[in-house]
């Protein structure tokens, strides 16, 4: 499982463009990614702040999302809108969430170059204080 909370700050004046991209990515992701558990966007209380919650059956399913055609097409557009972004790996509390624990995975040995690159760039960060993974 992989669950991420993205903290996003948008460049001033780019909010409408960012929201339009999100409105394209959301349905495309839900329609084409069978291992997607949760994916949504929220406006924060501070101007230009947004949050995205992403949850997948596995870390490699998250990487498949990142390397999907619709995400790769949107990435340059997103880059023009995003001023800053921090990915926070979060761990669902068992018994208080329907999502399983966040786990890290390595890319398969036969992974294509983009998948291997993204698996390293976005490697899951498992906090020391989280319960041990079975």
Please annotate each region the language model reported.
Residues 108-111, 125:
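Surface-exposed beta-loop interaction hotspot
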Residues 93-98:
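A short acidic, often aromatic-flanked loop/helix-cap motif at beta-alpha or helix-coil junctions
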Residues 13, 47, 73:
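Short alpha-helical
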Residues 2-9, 38-68, 88-89, 100-108:
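Short, well-ordered beta-strand segments in beta-rich or mixed alpha/beta enzyme
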Residues 9-20:
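Short, surface-exposed ligand-recognition loops at beta-strand->loop->(often short) alpha-helix junctions
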């Amino acid at each position: 499982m992989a669950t991420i909370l993205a903290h996003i700050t948008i460049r001033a004046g780019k909010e409408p463009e960012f929201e339009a991209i999100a409105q394209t990515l959301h349905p495309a992701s839900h329609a084409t990614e069978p291992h997607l558990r949760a994916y949504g966007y929220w406006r924060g209380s501070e101007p230009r702040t947004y949050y995205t919650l992403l949850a997948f059956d596995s870390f490699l399913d998250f990487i498949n999302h990142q390397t999907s055609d619709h995400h790769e097409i949107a990435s340059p557009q997103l880059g023009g809108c995003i001023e800053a972004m921090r990915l926070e790996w979060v761990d669902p509390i068992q018994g208080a969430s329907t999502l399983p624990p966040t786990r890290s995975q390595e890319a398969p040995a036969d992974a294509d170059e983009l998948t291997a690159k993204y698996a390293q760039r976005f490697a899951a960060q498992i906090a020391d204080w989280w319960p041990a993974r079975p």
